[in-house]
UniProtKB/Swiss-Prot annotation:
InterPro entries registered for this protein in UniProt: NA-bd_OB-fold, Rib_uL2_dom2, Ribosomal_uL2, Ribosomal_uL2_arc_euk, Ribosomal_uL2_C, Ribosomal_uL2_CS, Ribosomal_uL2_dom3, Ribosomal_uL2_RNA-bd_dom
Keyword check for Nucleus: no
PROSITE patterns documented for this protein: RIBOSOMAL_L2
NCBIfam families xref list: PRK09612.1
Gene symbol of the encoding locus: RpL8
Organism in which the protein naturally occurs: Drosophila melanogaster
SUPFAM superfamilies (UniProt xref): Nucleic acid-binding proteins, Translation proteins SH3-like domain
Keywords for the protein's UniProt record, in alphabetical order: Cytoplasm, Ribonucleoprotein, Ribosomal protein, RNA-binding, rRNA-binding
GO terms of biological process kind: cytoplasmic translation
Segments for region (Disordered): 208-230
Protein name: Large ribosomal subunit protein uL2
Pfam families: Ribosomal_L2 (PF00181), Ribosomal_L2_C (PF03947)
Subcellular locations according to the entry: Cytoplasm
Amino acid sequence: MGRVIRAQRKGAGSVFKAHVKKRKGAAKLRSLDFAERSGYIRGVVKDIIHDPGRGAPLAVVHFRDPYRYKIRKELFIAPEGMHTGQFVYCGRKATLQIGNVMPLSQMPEGTIICNLEEKTGDRGRLARTSGNYATVIAHNQDTKKTRVKLPSGAKKVVPSANRAMVGIVAGGGRIDKPILKAGRAYHKYKVKRNSWPKVRGVAMNPVEHPHGGGNHQHIGKASTVKRGTSAGRKVGLIAARRTGRIRGGKGDSKDK
């Protein structure tokens, strides 16, 4: 019997526990309340902080609670251009400027947004990674829906009552800088999850992986496996319809 391979270790098992030991907290928009639905509420950016394991910086924003004598501290994903001391306005009657949070219905077409809600009141789900943004494409007044273009290029229709922050997420160009050495990759993934380094199966011993062993690094058998293969053997090209290079193309017909 071989060892438990990597695919089995990372697969289904006990309840997943996220790696959040040094994280600063969950970055979300304010809870949707009467103040935001009817008018606006003002906050002030107290600090811009780094969150380990996250590419984008976070903004610590203080709001005065509209219902009781208390200061509410919120963690927002910081857009490009936000600074400490800046006033942030959240609500239907907020102005269109970087860092403000508004419903999509109040934004003109072509507005660049980030931290967009997928469902009304979920406090931000889309376009949250460093340098990412979504674009408001069109509003439908009859159905109260808005069409947005996501960072992937896909178009999505969401309710016009969904909120979003105006601007581009800060930290753009982060992946342009090469990692260059293993030490930096080690520290990068140490705060994220146990996903590095990735050792190839052919570089292992036969007890550790189905592709391991041999006097030189080769798989030694067909790398295609069927869909119902047992967990420890299910590596390689799983339930592949075809393998190999795709040769030729549509314009290759000889009888032109």
